[in-house]
Amino acid sequence: MPPKVKFSKEEIIHTAVELTREQGFDAITARDVGARLGTSSKPVYTAFASMQELKHAVIEQAYARYQQLEQQTVSEGKYPPYKSMGMAYIRFAQEEPNLFRLLFMRDRTGEADTDYGYQDAVQMVQTQTGLDQDSASLFHTEIWIAVHGIAVMFATAYLDWDMELVSRMLTDFYQGLKSRQIAE
């Protein structure tokens, strides 16, 4: 007979996500997750075939939190949709630095490419600017590099700018690139 389940997969994932939020992804060990649950590591291995499986579930949950923040930011309507995506990315880095590091600053060697909404963003740029696919892709990549740089500075506590200043900068990046594209 299999061991009795003391904690659900969801409880274990939630605990592992909270550990990641507080201490970073490296803090996820079966022993530490078990200790946080007030037990041994055994329930972790009962619920998951391996730590890799649990870590994959934590990444999925972190991405779901990011998507939720992005959707919330877009639906608030404070910024145009494309800008909202950048503002949400930076806000996620500011509010959830360890989850941001997990999703967007970890070594990807050996991992499959993840789109993370790239094609949707390129389509949005095409619609807003009238650029062809290749030009819109370059445009978005250049914007994303600037947004990612600001987000990394927030996630690493290098700076803590006011979000209105960040908004102004994103507008400047967008308008500058758009002006250059039109001139070409």
Regions found by a protein language model. Give the residues of each.
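Hydrophobic alpha-helical connector segments
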Residues: 71-98, 133, 143
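Amphipathic alpha-helical packing segments from all-alpha helical-bundle domains
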Residues: 104-142, 167-176
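Short hydrophobic clusters on alpha-helical segments that form packing/core surfaces
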Residues: 12-20, 62, 66, 89, ...
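Amphipathic C-terminal alpha-helical segment
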Residues: 95, 99-105, 145-162, 175-184
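Amphipathic alpha-helical linker/stalk segments
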Residues: 56, 60-84, 121-128
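Alpha-helical DNA-contacting segments of helix-turn-helix folds
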Residues: 20, 53-62, 103, 107, ...
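Helix-turn-helix
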Residues: 11, 15, 19-53, 57
